[in-house]
Curated annotation (Swiss-Prot):
Enzyme class: hydrolase
Protein name: Uncharacterized acyl-CoA thioester hydrolase HI_0827
Record-linked Gene3D superfamilies: Hotdog Thioesterase
PROSITE patterns: HOTDOG_ACOT
Record GO biological process: acyl-CoA metabolic process; fatty acid catabolic process
Length: 154
């Protein structure tokens, strides 16, 4: 199974697969679509996974930029969060998170497309909740993230 999705127009998901789950009836809003707050929660968890790996420890979400809800998610859709590190500062990490779905319970079966994207900013914190410096030495996750950032087109 391919880790990245490609839609019918050839657009491909960006970054690494962070989280994969199933949209359930308990996650719906009053219209019967999946609730935007649930989607945002999944994105925050997925982005935090990547940020924690880079920061080598605890992180907190401090900002969410440009949240775009592109298409609704239906009950039964496979929901996949992809993350891509955009920037690493002294204690902060910016992660772009895209949510893609794969239709498995409704038409058109098998179709994949992007439904939401946003940029999350996380800050590395110590056990007292104070910001801390992201370790630079012996940090393979940071090295991988920085290498991918340098490869991104402007």
């Amino acid at each position: 199974m391919s880790a990245n999705f490609t839609d019918k127009n050839g657009r491909q998901s960006k970054g690494v697969l962070l989280l994969r789950t199933l949209a359930m009836p308990s996650d719906t809003n009053a219209n019967g679509d999946i609730f935007g707050g649930w989607i945002m929660s999944q994105m925050d968890m997925g982005g935090a996974i990547l940020a924690k790996e880079i920061a080598h420890g605890r992180v907190v979400t401090v900002a969410v930029e440009s949240m775009n809800f592109i298409k609704p998610i239906s009950v039964g859709d496979v929901v996949c969060c992809y993350g891509q590190c955009l920037k690493v500062g002294r204690s902060s990490i910016k992660i772009k998170v895209e949510v893609w779905v794969k239709k498995v319970a409704s038409e058109p079966i098998g179709e994949r497309y992007c439904v939401t994207d946003a940029v999350f900013t996380f800050v590395a914190v110590d056990n007292n909740g104070r910001s801390r410096t992201i370790p630079r030495e012996n940090n393979q996750e940071l090295e991988k993230a920085l290498a991918l950032i340098s490869e991104q087109p402007l």
